[in-house]
Amino acid sequence: NKRINAMAEDGDPFAKLIVETDTFGSRVRVRGAETGLYICMNKKGKLIAKSNGKGKDCVFTEIELENNYTALQNAKYEGWYM
């Protein structure tokens, strides 16, 4: 497992993400295009990266908010968001 560092630097090649659908509906997995690692959540609510994204800790449910933004709620730890 690797730590995730989000520095918000424009043009950073590690900022490109690939969103994969998990099932019919609004469940997705997110992985880094450069690394191939999946964004997951640990039991403390911290974002971590894993090479295998098959666990529920790596699945997120898309929730559309009133302001038209999309929130990603972790499938394993409901109430925790990315």
Swiss-Prot record:
GO-annotated molecular function: growth factor activity; type 1 fibroblast growth factor receptor binding; type 2 fibroblast growth factor receptor binding
SMART domains xref list: FGF
The keyword Zinc-finger appears for this protein: no
SS bonds (residue pairs): none
Alphabetized InterPro entries for the sequence: Fibroblast_GF_fam (IPR002209), IL1/FGF (IPR008996)
GO cellular component: cytoplasm; extracellular space
Coiled coil, from the record: none
GO biological process: dorsal/ventral pattern formation; fibroblast growth factor receptor signaling pathway; neurogenesis; outflow tract septum morphogenesis; positive regulation of cell division; positive regulation of cell population proliferation; positive regulation of MAPK cascade; regulation of cell migration
Pfam family, one: FGF
Protein keywords: Developmental protein, Differentiation, Glycoprotein, Growth factor, Mitogen, Secreted
Superkingdom classification of source: Eukaryota
Predominant location category: secreted
Subcellular localization, as worded in the UniProt entry: Secreted
Glycosylation site positions: N68
Family matches, as PANTHER family: FIBROBLAST GROWTH FACTOR
The family this protein is said to belong to: Belongs to the heparin-binding growth factors family.
Role played: Plays an important role in the regulation of embryonic development, cell proliferation, cell differentiation and cell migration. Required for normal brain, eye, ear and limb development during embryogenesis. Required for normal development of the gonadotropin-releasing hormone (GnRH) neuronal system. Plays a role in neurite outgrowth in hippocampal cells.
Subunit field text: Monomer. Homodimer. Interacts with FGFR1, FGFR2, FGFR3 and FGFR4. Affinity between fibroblast growth factors (FGFs) and their receptors is increased by heparan sulfate glycosaminoglycans that function as coreceptors.
Protein name: Fibroblast growth factor 8
